Amino acid sequence: MDYLDKLTHLAQVRGEINIRCEFQGEWQISHQEKDAGKGIFHLIEQGECWLTLNEKQFHLKEGDVFFLPQNQPHSMHYSANKRADIPTKKSHQGLFELHQIGRGTPDLKMFCGNFYYQQDALLTASMPEYLHINLCDTPIHPLVQLFLQEAQKNDAGTKSVVDALSNVLLIYILRHAIQQNLIEQGILFALQDKRLNTALIAILQQPQNDWHIEQLAELATMSRANFIRIFQQHIGMSPGRFLTKVRLQSAAFLLKQSQQSVLAIALEVGYQSEAHFCKVFKNYYQLSPSQYRKSVSL
């Protein structure tokens, strides 16, 4: 499992594409919700529009995806000039909730979806405020075409296919953002630093090890003091705090996805005492491991 797979597992990412928009004429819609545990994205199938985020405007056209990792309030409109919101007519079309404005042939066709993840996940803390990418000339484009084809169907399992494709879409978006140097903070940024990469991957892959600063600094071929300083600058926390987060987020994933006992999970992620593990886990999640397991299985 590589680092991006590991981080998406720790974040417990779950994607869905649930809204299709067909807008005609002069229109504007607003999204006022803010949710640290949910990201939202807009995928332009046909046409063009404008999106305003924190007074900054973006021109979206066919093939664009606009991803807001923390679901920031924003508005979308047919032109660069903002107007009053226009109510949408809502109905259902196959898998999707259909939002319509206007009665003629749509000028804009757009899909909207969500990514859900654990709050305070290392992955989401590394994401920028937004990502605006045109997918037409990228390796992601065939995936988008496959999604558009699947979205027209109503076959058995289509929803599972569409939601699975949304998870793949997130990986491609993040991969593209990393390759284009659009990530400037957190774990994804730090992993691009050759000095820190080896130490970070060692922690991600083996959080159960009894890691010491000296060992990690040696892996990074840096002095102890320099390692701590650079680590803090890149990730915004100490190596010890980072290790604790990886252990606890690994434990949360196992509590949700496995039937292992709390003790077995504690040992697997690096705690030698179930009591100590439960105390640290509850301080972090405000729930005991057993309470957490029940809450995510509802």
UniProtKB/Swiss-Prot annotation:
<dbReference type="InterPro" id="IPR032783">
    <property type="entry name" value="AraC_lig"/>
</dbReference>
<dbReference type="InterPro" id="IPR009057">
    <property type="entry name" value="Homeodomain-like_sf"/>
</dbReference>
<feature type="DNA-binding region" description="H-T-H motif">
    <location>
        <begin position="214"/>
        <end position="235"/>
    </location>
</feature>
<dbReference type="InterPro" id="IPR014710">
    <property type="entry name" value="RmlC-like_jellyroll"/>
</dbReference>
<keyword id="KW-0804">Transcription</keyword>
<keyword id="KW-0238">DNA-binding</keyword>
<dbReference type="GO" id="GO:0043565">
    <property type="term" value="F:sequence-specific DNA binding"/>
</dbReference>
<dbReference type="Pfam" id="PF12852">
    <property type="entry name" value="Cupin_6"/>
</dbReference>
<dbReference type="InterPro" id="IPR018062">
    <property type="entry name" value="HTH_AraC-typ_CS"/>
</dbReference>
<dbReference type="InterPro" id="IPR018060">
    <property type="entry name" value="HTH_AraC"/>
</dbReference>
<dbReference type="InterPro" id="IPR037923">
    <property type="entry name" value="HTH-like"/>
</dbReference>
<dbReference type="InterPro" id="IPR020449">
    <property type="entry name" value="Tscrpt_reg_AraC-type_HTH"/>
</dbReference>
<protein>
    <recommendedName>
        <fullName>Uncharacterized HTH-type transcriptional regulator HI_1052</fullName>
    </recommendedName>
</protein>
<feature type="DNA-binding region" description="H-T-H motif">
    <location>
        <begin position="262"/>
        <end position="285"/>
    </location>
</feature>
<dbReference type="GO" id="GO:0003700">
    <property type="term" value="F:DNA-binding transcription factor activity"/>
</dbReference>
<feature type="domain" description="HTH araC/xylS-type">
    <location>
        <begin position="194"/>
        <end position="295"/>
    </location>
</feature>
<keyword id="KW-0805">Transcription regulation</keyword>
<dbReference type="Pfam" id="PF12833">
    <property type="entry name" value="HTH_18"/>
</dbReference>
